Amino acid sequence: MPPRLAAALALACATLILGACGFSPLYAQPGVTSGLADIQVAAPRGRVGYLVGEALDDALATRPGAPAWRLDLDLSEQRFPRGLRVDNVATRYEYVLTAAYTLRDTATDAPAKVGRVRVELTYDSADQPYASVAAQQDAQERAAAEAARRIQLELAAWFAQQDAP
């Protein structure tokens, strides 16, 4: 059997098997995409708050108009030295970003979903001050993007459950 035919057959079988077991993509659920687009993000002040807020605005594809939901965020950052040299100077740091969020109905201000995501990553600290600051800012950007991605997935799963029979 030619390899292309075998690959096509395998793909067709996989599609049938996934369809038979009730698999459906998360965003195929009615109301998930529109629910996510109806969220206004209320990010805290500061660099990381701005980064998380912008990443969530991009991920949720917020549309103009009066939102049905408001997402309140509370962020906390921690930085731990790891990998110490002989002279007791850290060469690596662990950066931890914790994002607690509350999804509120804008009509009643009642909390609908409460959650927390935690992102941990490490970065190198160079001897040059500018390189060290750039590495820390890069870690903040990566952590903010990952926190926004996780919040988006949790909210999408919640919206999918709300519309499920």
Where are these regions (language model features)?
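C-terminal motif of bacterial Sec signal peptides marking the signal peptidase cleavage site
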Residues: L16-A20
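Bacterial N-terminal signal peptides that target proteins for export
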Residues: M1-A10
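Bacterial signal peptide processing site
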Residues: G22-P25
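Acidic/histidine-rich, surface-exposed loop or edge segments in extracytoplasmic proteins
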Residues: T33-A43, Q128-A131
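C-terminal/domain-edge helix-coil "capping" segments
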Residues: A134-P165
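Surface-exposed short loop/turn segments
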Residues: R63-R70, D74-R116, L121-D138, R142
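Post-signal-peptide N-terminal segment of Sec-exported extracytoplasmic proteins
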Residues: A42-D74
